[in-house]
Curated annotation (Swiss-Prot):
This is Acetyl-coenzyme A carboxylase carboxyl transferase subunit alpha. One of its GO terms (biological process) is malonyl-CoA biosynthetic process. The gene is accA. It comes from Polynucleobacter necessarius subsp. necessarius (strain STIR1). Pathway: Lipid metabolism; malonyl-CoA biosynthesis; malonyl-CoA from acetyl-CoA: step 1/1. Transmembrane segments: none annotated.
């Protein structure tokens, strides 16, 4: 698959294009230019390292949305075995923007749930671009309850711009569906390991992300609103999205510093979309380490730990103004 380069990667794109041209010439000619190709490849690699070591929050947002980034089904196919997808919320419909089912991770039975955006136009329409309706969240809740009944851990993968804001979703009580999921996750008697793999957009993300362990990919985002949405509200124009991204504190590094997530999962150089195998290797290790934390933990201890974790969010200190 040919890599799609973002606006801030144009220098990298030019180098990669030159390398491809030279490789074509090498194949069609008896002249050995392998040394020049190697030199350009090393230059491209170093430039990529330099660019990705200094990404702004807005650039991180762009990487998080990259169309070639691994989605939930990519992780399911690479990390889990015996996946059996389960459909429907048993109330209204089967929302294809959230997929889920029984599987095995490292030979241990588990439940996997995650957003799926879609690769092409047809699939994106089917998946509603990863924006879930109430039936999607109710399906996720049903699968969580099923995992609880079987006594198996839940893995969730979050990648959504946010819950679908359409009239039909509101008519079927979108806010109640999200709120009910938060309630269920707070009391679920099995471990929940949530990973933000791309966009973590507001309540639409939180509805399947209240984990006992919350992981974030290095170039993913997690925020109450998108930078464009924030800019449109504060400055009445989406042109201020870059400034909004700075103020939202939506990067993994910022959220880790605030104690809102537990672990940052490193991405390969140039982002997860540049090296699927490397990303899957890093993810497997991170999930295995997180799951091991809860080995043998009794239900009461698990729930106490989760409660303490949730109550630790949003603490503040009052300071009396000097007269």
């Amino acid at each position: 698959m040919k890599t799609t380069f973002l606006d801030f990667e144009q220098q990298i794109a030019e180098l990669e294009s030159k390398i491809e041209e030279l490789r074509f010439v090498q194949d069609e000619s008896s002249v050995d230019i392998s040394d020049e190709i190697k030199m350009l490849a090393e230059k491209s690699l170093q430039l990529t390292k330099d660019v990705y070591a200094n990404l702004t929050p807005w650039q991180v947002s762009q990487v998080a949305r990259h169309p070639q980034r691994p989605y939930t089904l990519d992780y399911v196919g690479a990390l889990f075995t015996d996946f059996h997808e389960l459909h429907g919320d048993r109330t209204f419909a089967d929302d294809q923007s959230i997929i889920g089912g029984l599987a095995r991770f490292e030979n241990q039975p588990c439940m996997v749930i995650g957003h799926q955006k879609g690769r092409d136009t047809k699939e994106r329409a089917l998946r509603n671009f990863g924006m879930s309706r109430p039936e999607g969240y109710r399906k996720a809740m049903r699968l969580m309850r099923l995992a609880e009944k079987f006594g198996i851990p839940v893995f969730t993968f979050v990648d959504t711009p946010g819950a679908f804001p359409g009239i039909d979703a509101e008519e079927r009580n979108q806010s109640e569906a999200i709120g009910r999921n938060l309630y269920v996750q707070a009391e679920l008697e099995v471990p929940i390991i949530a990973t933000i793999i791309g966009e973590g957009g507001s309540g639409g993300a939180l509805a399947i992300a209240m984990g006992d362990a919350v992981l974030m990919l290095q170039n993913s985002t997690y925020s109450v609103i998108s930078p464009e949405g924030c800019a449109s509200i504060l400055w009445k124009t989406a042109d201020k999205a870059s400034e909004a991204a700075e103020q939202l504190g939506l990067t993994a590094q910022r959220l880790k510093a605030l104690g809102l997530i537990d672990k940052i999962v490193a991405e390969p150089i140039g982002g997860a979309h540049r090296d699927y195998d490397g990303m899957m290797s890093n993810m497997r290790k991170a999930l295995a380490e997180s799951l091991k934390t809860f080995d043998g933990m009794k239900v009461d201890a698990l729930l106490d730990r989760r409660h303490e974790r949730l109550m630790s969010y949003g603490k503040f200190k009052e300071i009396t103004a000097k007269s």
